[in-house]
């Protein structure tokens, strides 16, 4: 399955929140090798940390990029890692207009589908970011070997 299919599965069928959906879907697609217990760390980021702040789907994307990029700590690869995160935030914002849940929900939330549209757009932003990084560094694998 591709990322969008996995997003639909985890969000609609398994009923995970936005950040949980992104990490679970990406774990399957990009073989992140995260166990179920570790992925629970993203649970509290749903609905912008349940306070309308930074979108949980975007936080999920940043978590995925962290797992793909970082060998030991961010400071060891800061210039490349910073660029990847900034690209992801840019791609996300271009599609959804903001990074704050409270500003995204009014135009993206559906009473029946909830935040599915936002999570799908976040997945697209993640995929675009990975593609841009792979192109820049002439990489073939989804795993970003800047480690």
Language-model region placement:
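C-terminal binding/interaction regions
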Residues: 81-147
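Conserved active-site and cofactor/substrate-binding residues in soluble primary-metabolism enzymes
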Residues: 2, 17, 21, 36, ...
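Polybasic, low-complexity association/targeting segments
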Residues: 1-14
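Short glycine/serine- and small hydrophobic-enriched flexible loop segments
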Residues: 24-28, 63-70, 124-128
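Glycine/serine-rich anion-binding loops at beta->alpha junctions
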Residues: 44-67
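Phosphate-handling active-site elements
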Residues: 29-40, 66-84
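Acidic-glycine-rich active-site phosphate/pyrophosphate-binding loop
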Residues: 23-43, 93-99
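Structural motif
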Residues: 13-16, 52-53
């Amino acid at each position: 399955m591709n990322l969008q299919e996995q997003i639909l599965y985890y969000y609609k069928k398994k009923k995970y929140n936005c950040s949980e959906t992104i990490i679970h879907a990406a774990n399957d697609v990009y073989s992140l090798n995260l166990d179920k217990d570790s992925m629970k760390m993203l649970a509290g980021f749903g609905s912008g940390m349940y306070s309308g702040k930074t979108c949980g789907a975007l936080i999920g994307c940043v978590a995925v990029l962290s797992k793909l990029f970082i060998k030991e700590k961010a400071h060891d690869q800061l210039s490349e890692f910073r660029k990847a995160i900034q690209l992801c935030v840019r791609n996300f914002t271009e599609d959804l207009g903001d990074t704050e849940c409270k500003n995204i929900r009014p135009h993206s939330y559906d009473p029946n589908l909830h935040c599915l549209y936002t999570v799908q757009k976040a997945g697209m932003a993640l995929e675009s970011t990975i593609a841009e990084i792979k192109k820049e560094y002439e990489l073939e694998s989804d795993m970003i070997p800047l480690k």
